[in-house]
C-alpha cells in the first residue's frame, strides 16, 4: 500500500465490503473521484482481489477443521493446487517445519471431515496428515489499521 488513504480505504472496505464510493469518500473525507481512482489502482495492483460476503459458518451449521500436512517440497505446489480446488477449504498455507501445508476447512458435518481426511491419507504426495476440529473465537478481523 502506498499511503494512509489506501490503508483507510482497505480497512473501511474490510469492515463493510458493500460500501459504495460515496460512503467511502465520506468515511475518509476524500473526493469520490479520488476514491474511485484509488480503488481502481488497488484492484489493478492486486491489493484488492475481489469483494465477498463474510459468513458466520457456525450459524450455518458448519464445523471448522485445520488440516496439517507433511508434504515433500517437490509436491507442495501440486498438493496446494488440489486443496484450493476443494470448496471446503477456505484458506491454504504453505509453511515451514514438519507440516509444510496447513489448510483451514469448513465442513457440513463430521462425516465430511472424515472423508476429506481419508482422501488425504490416500494421497501419495502427502506423507502425514493431522486434523484438528476448532471452535472459531474470532475470524475475519482486518489486521490493517487505518492511519
Task: Describe each region flagged by the PLM.
Residues 1-147:
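A compositional/biophysical signature of low hydrophobicity enriched in polar/charged and small residues
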Amino acid at each position: 500500500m502506498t499511503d494512509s488513504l489506501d490503508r483507510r480505504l482497505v480497512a473501511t472496505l474490510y469492515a463493510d465490503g458493500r460500501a459504495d464510493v460515496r460512503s467511502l469518500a465520506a468515511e475518509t473525507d476524500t473526493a469520490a473521484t479520488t476514491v474511485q481512482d484509488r480503488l481502481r489502482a488497488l484492484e489493478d495492483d492486486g491489493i484488492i482481489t475481489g469483494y465477498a460476503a463474510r459468513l458466520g459458518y457456525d450459524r450455518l451449521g458448519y464445523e471448522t477443521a485445520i488440516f496439517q500436512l507433511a508434504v515433500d517440497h517437490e509436491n507442495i505446489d501440486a498438493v496446494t493446487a488440489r486443496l484450493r480446488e476443494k470448496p471446503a477449504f477456505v484458506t491454504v498455507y504453505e509453511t515451514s517445519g514438519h507440516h509444510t501445508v496447513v489448510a483451514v476447512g469448513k465442513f457440513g458435518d463430521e462425516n465430511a471431515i472424515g472423508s476429506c481426511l481419508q482422501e488425504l491419507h490416500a494421497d501419495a504426495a502427502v506423507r502425514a496428515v493431522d486434523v484438528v476440529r476448532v471452535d472459531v473465537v474470532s475470524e475475519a478481523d482486518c489486521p490493517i489499521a487505518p492511519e
